[in-house]
Regions:
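N-terminal secretory-pathway/extracellular module detecting exported/lumenal segments
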Residues: 20-193
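C-terminal motif of bacterial Sec signal peptides marking the signal peptidase cleavage site
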Residues: 15-18
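Bacterial N-terminal signal peptides that target proteins for export
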Residues: 1-7
Length: 193
């Protein structure tokens, strides 16, 4: 019986020693693009999708949200314009109303993976879009005043907060979340679909 236990233990030990690779070496970890028995495929470079400007925002489609920080402005997302595009950028119309009644309208995008914000167009005359000549991605930062970009990205758009790599869900679920936000203590959204 003792011999049988010893034989089983020896077989188990021999099996685990041989698992590492050739002659007890650890298995090689392959990086993206390297060749090997199970190489990781090359990741395609990110390409931004072509955009089509949505219809100009209508008051009945606006969803009020409250940004963190100090502001006297009111901030709205046009729920009918919000999309999650194949390039994983969330695009939407934003309306900002000042306490004095001035209105700023923009068509913007948020890239959760890079924590980037881009304005594609503005509505300077109140009923039509004017494209930005050379729109550029800018970093989203947590600020004290008019913190709408950070609030949208970290609390509504990006799963696990910004730099997360992905949107929280499809356009309908994000709009639903904007209409029914979590309690003020729930700052980082879960994935919701």
């Amino acid at each position: 019986m003792r011999g049988l236990v010893f034989l089983v233990a020896a077989c188990i030990l021999a099996g685990t020693v041989g698992c590492g690779g050739t002659r007890g070496e650890a298995p090689k970890a392959y990086r993206r693009g390297e060749s090997g028995p199970n190489p990781m495929p090359e990741e395609a470079p990110w390409k931004e999708a072509d955009i089509t400007l949505p219809p100009y925002p209508r008051d009945q489609d606006l969803i009020l949200f409250e940004p963190r920080g100090q502001t006297t402005n009111r901030f709205y997302v046009d729920g009918s314009s919000l999309t999650v595009d194949p390039d994983r950028v969330i695009r939407f119309s934003l309306v900002i109303r000042s306490a004095e009644g001035a209105r700023t309208v923009s068509y913007s995008g948020v890239n959760c993976k890079t924590a980037g914000w881009k304005d594609y167009a503005f509505g300077p005359d109140g009923d039509r879009w004017e494209r930005v000549a050379d729109p550029q991605w800018r970093e989203i930062r947590d600020q004290q005043m008019n913190n709408h970009q950070y609030t949208l990205a970290s609390e509504f758009f990006c799963y696990g907060g910004i730099f997360s790599g992905g949107p929280t869900g499809d356009a309908k679920s994000i709009v639903r979340h904007l209409k029914h936000p979590p309690t003020p203590d729930a700052r980082v959204p879960a994935r919701y679909n």
